[in-house]
Amino acid sequence: MAGVRFGVVVFPGSNCDRDVAWVTRGLLGCPTRLIWHRETDLSELDVVVLPGGFSYGDYLRCGAIARFAPVMGSLKEHAARGGYVLGICNGFQILTEAGLLPGALVRNANLHFICDRVGIRVERQDLPWTSAYPQGSTLTLPIAHGEGRYTCDPDTLKQLQDRGQIVFRYAPVAPNGSVDNIAGICDPSGRILGLMPHPERAADPDLPGQDGIPFWQSILRSFAA
């Protein structure tokens, strides 16, 4: 279904917006609009993506300033009416800062920026983001972050575990020290997803490492169902 309408938010300091648009527009063939952070009209969109990068230079902390951008109020309205929201890397950080997902992303345990390809286990295959993956899949996806260690209080962690909101885990172990090896979580509805790995960087059919392709195909499946 090539009619799924994507929007990719562009903050000052974003640097993965065009990577995402290349996948949604070039690979999936879906209409895709780059949305400047001051825009507020998201009414025609099905999926809004907050991409990776360093929004506002990561001043204060990652995502702390981006949460106040004009587009974020409209994003919350989009989510409230059942729209899909995806946050990748810095986008995940922004979603936690905005309260759309619980917990926080903090400095990596080793205090170093980590740029690598890592093992990622898919914990749920029944979501709009994962249905194209075989049961029990372990992927290889790129990560690139200095503040990617997921943390939350014990009660929140238990809720995430009990409600099945942990979608991706690092396998065999989190390189950044994330609690419970968490690499990505969703809200209770499954329509809002945040993850630190970059599926858009593993989706070019002409390059090695294509484990991100089923991620994007899953989104199309969910709208075709």
From Swiss-Prot:
Domain Glutamine amidotransferase type-1: 6-225
Main location: cytoplasm
Keywords from the UniProt entry: ATP-binding, Cytoplasm, Glutamine amidotransferase, Hydrolase, Ligase, Nucleotide-binding, Purine biosynthesis
Cellular localisation: Cytoplasm
Highest taxon above the source species: Bacteria
Function: Part of the phosphoribosylformylglycinamidine synthase complex involved in the purines biosynthetic pathway. Catalyzes the ATP-dependent conversion of formylglycinamide ribonucleotide (FGAR) and glutamine to yield formylglycinamidine ribonucleotide (FGAM) and glutamate. The FGAM synthase complex is composed of three subunits. PurQ produces an ammonia molecule by converting glutamine to glutamate. PurL transfers the ammonia molecule to FGAR to form FGAM in an ATP-dependent manner.
Assembly, per entry: Part of the FGAM synthase complex composed of 1 PurL, 1 PurQ and 2 PurS subunits.
Protein's name according to its UniProt entry: Phosphoribosylformylglycinamidine synthase subunit PurQ
Species the sequence originates in: Synechococcus sp. (strain JA-2-3B'a(2-13)) (Cyanobacteria bacterium Yellowstone B-Prime)
